């Protein structure tokens, strides 16, 4: 079996709306919004400032980075790296969460750098392994770059696919 925490931890200033379910051994960061009717299975980790649209569900052991926006009705079966939006069925990358990032004081330059990283990951001809190596070697280190790369490296189930690319 799995070694459980024995508790679920919910951060500060979270909003959990009606009929949502958060299962055992989950960890939610601060300022997380869970809209009506969401289901979060056991052992899920959700980063700060993430918003889950209504009737979304996260598969057990899922990892969701910070500043993520999950569209309503999305079934989350893969990990979602920080700063992105996901939507559709099957779930796929839908751009970066630029509105959320601006609301939280990210400069246009920081947002542009995040967009550049995800362009290499999801809109180039490289697969995720090639893109992460390229980003690591060719882009200057920033807090966001390092966080994205660390998240991807530590994702046991793999990350969301790029829209229409079929690449993971």
What kind of region is each of these model predictions?
Residues 89-168:
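Terminal amphipathic alpha-helical/low-complexity segments used for targeting or macromolecular assembly
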Residues 1-92:
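Structural signal for interior beta-strand "rungs" in well-ordered beta-sheet cores
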């Amino acid at each position: 079996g799995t070694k459980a925490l024995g508790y679920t931890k919910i951060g500060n200033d979270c909003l959990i709306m009606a009929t949502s379910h958060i299962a055992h051994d989950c960890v939610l960061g601060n300022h997380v919004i869970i809209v009506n009717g969401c289901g979060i299975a056991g052992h899920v980790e959700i980063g700060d400032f993430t918003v889950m649209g209504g009737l979304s569900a996260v598969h057990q052991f899922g990892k969701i980075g910070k500043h993520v926006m999950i569209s309503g009705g999305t079934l989350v079966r893969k990990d979602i790296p920080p700063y992105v939006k996901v939507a559709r069925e099957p779930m796929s990358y839908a751009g970066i969460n630029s509105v959320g990032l601006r609301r939280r004081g990210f400069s246009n330059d920081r947002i542009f750098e995040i967009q550049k990283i995800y362009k290499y990951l999801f809109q180039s001809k490289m697969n995720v392994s090639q893109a992460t190596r390229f980003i690591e070697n060719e882009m200057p280190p920033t807090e966001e770059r390092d966080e994205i790369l660390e998240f991807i490296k530590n994702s046991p189930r793999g990350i969301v696919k790029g829209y229409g690319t079929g690449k993971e």
